[in-house]
Amino acid sequence: TAFATPIAIAIPPKVDRFIIDTYCPAVVTKSFPQSGITVFGAFPHTHLQGQSVWTKIIRNKKAVEYLFNAEAYNFNYQFENILPKPIKLYPGDELATRCVYHTTNKNEISLGGEKTKDEMCMHMFMYYPRMKNFYGCSTINSLESWSRLMNSSASSFDFEVFRKWLIELKWTPELSEQWQNFYNNAPRVVVSGPTNNITLTNLARLPDYEDLKPAECKRSIINTAIRSVFLSMSFTLTSFFVTIASRFF
């Protein structure tokens, strides 16, 4: 999850596809019970510009499966999704989450925030047994990385100056491409733990991992399914016409 703040989410306008990746490292899940927790539901959430949200389970630097994949996300059509089968998470597991945005309909930057016109990147899960010392895992781009991008040498980070700078940026395709590169490589700060006792973990960059292999298209299965549907429709239509004919003859 990325915090709903401009420090975490600042998406250029007029971009067909902008990616924000977040990462929950092993240090966050080390307090999970040794027997694991069982995830049985998922609720992905962005605002109007979001197109897809997914979270992968990373185990020993290798993606083992999707925890959930909302490949075709729509803000106006949101669900609490019950998983086809429960999934176990264990101490030391890591979670990689990606939100993808489409902003070709916008003329100004989209910033993280709670208003519908702002943006979010969240993936919430239902699980058991309950853990009292675990609330969530969120990331922001480090303040130092933003200061370097702004070419600022100020001794402290001024959030109002930062927000004003973002809003006044003049966007070009080249700047949007540079912006994506910044997001791909910027150091992150991971915020985790209960709200009254949060833990901050620094990531020099998003960790690398061996990704899932692309799923193969089962063309023969698809063709068989289409053929079955076609035959079923043909039989239904034939029965319909026979019924109609019997009424007139």
What do these predicted regions represent?
Residues 244-249:
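C-terminal membrane-anchoring or membrane-association module
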Residues 1-221:
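Beta-strand-centric surfaces of beta-sandwich/beta-rich domains
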Residues 217-237:
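C-terminal GPI-anchoring signal of eukaryotic secretory precursors
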